[in-house]
Amino acid sequence: MSAYLNALGLLCALGQGKAEVARGLFAGDTGGMQPTPGWIPERQPPVGTVTAPLPAWPLEWTPFFSRNNQLLLAALTEIEPQVRQAIERHGPARIGVVLGTSTSGIHEASLGIAVHQRSGQLPDGYQYAQQELVAPADFLARYLGLSGPCYGLSTACTSSARALLSARRLLVQGHCDAVLCGGVDSLCGLTLNGFAALEAVSESLCNPFSVNRCGINIGEGAALFLLTREPGPIALLGGGASSDAHHISAPDPSGRGAVQAMQAALRASGLQPGDIGYLNLHGTATPHNDAMESQATHQVFPAGVPCSSTKPLTGHTLGAAGALEAAFAWLTLDPWLNPAGQLPPQRWDGQADPALPRLALTDADSRLDGRRHAMSNSFAFGGSNVSLILGATP
């Protein structure tokens, strides 16, 4: 059964909305990645902050206020007419909500704990529900008056990629007629300092797949799709998932789990490696991830595939990254937003790591060559791996 991504709302360091984000994506715009003090003591790493104006928060929804939900509401605003039409067509019980996140409410919880440490009491109006991982999905369902399946997924950096796979299963199994799916994550000090403690944060713009790579940049963002059976221009053809069970934070260096996920995605989509016209790499610019992903990509695509990491443009948006980068694949395949068939260019210093297989990294002149399928990879702590494949419909 085909599942179509029939509406897309998104915002990140590249901007807000499909048109603005597409312009920045295909220009390789890194201007949203700015050195930012205040997150990590005595450091100013580049951070991908959403600077677009966010909707005023409705007073009646004050108990649900968080930065995550603000970003989510902004993404919803872009596609709300299509969502309301789906609710009218199918009814609120037949619309599901599946969202991925990893920082849901952590910032609000940190602020509350800080007040409690000083005063012995939580601040007035503090809501424990703000820090639940299901909070974004719960807010969205309540806001829209939906009563279909509603849940959140949190598998670190594969969270929202898994949300898209889970949403597709809800359609295939007949539990829903439409699903709002995607991911959202916002910046928070606990997360940034946690990565800093792992010595994984770069002091400069991240440099994926370079011999000089030295760590990640963190960003925030939201991407929200309306997934339905009604035919549309872009389909979620399938996906694959695997688990390394290798290490709590490091990937299996052989790339075994990543290979399994990519091969499973190809099988589920009925495609061969040569059918993929663009691969969005996870490409965090850490020594371990990029080494593993280079090996895995070479195993699955021995003849090569045009590919790039978009992390230098947005930062690593963690639980939102899978959905956000699926959105980048969506924009790449959309002939209206990308009439020239541009591919997102790789932004790096151009110095390949001689210890790794050479990848066919894109540049400003790279174009789709007629193959209308794109794969997006997401790999996470704990060895969680997800690959998604999107396709442009004839």
Task: Enumerate the language-model features and the residues they cover.
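ACP-dependent fatty acid/polyketide chain-elongation machinery
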Residues: 1-62, 101, 229-239, 327-347, ...
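Conserved catalytic cysteine-centered active-site region
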Residues: 33-77, 104-166, 175, 191-193, ...
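Glycine-rich phosphate/pyrophosphate-binding beta-alpha loops
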Residues: 13, 103, 156, 284-286, ...
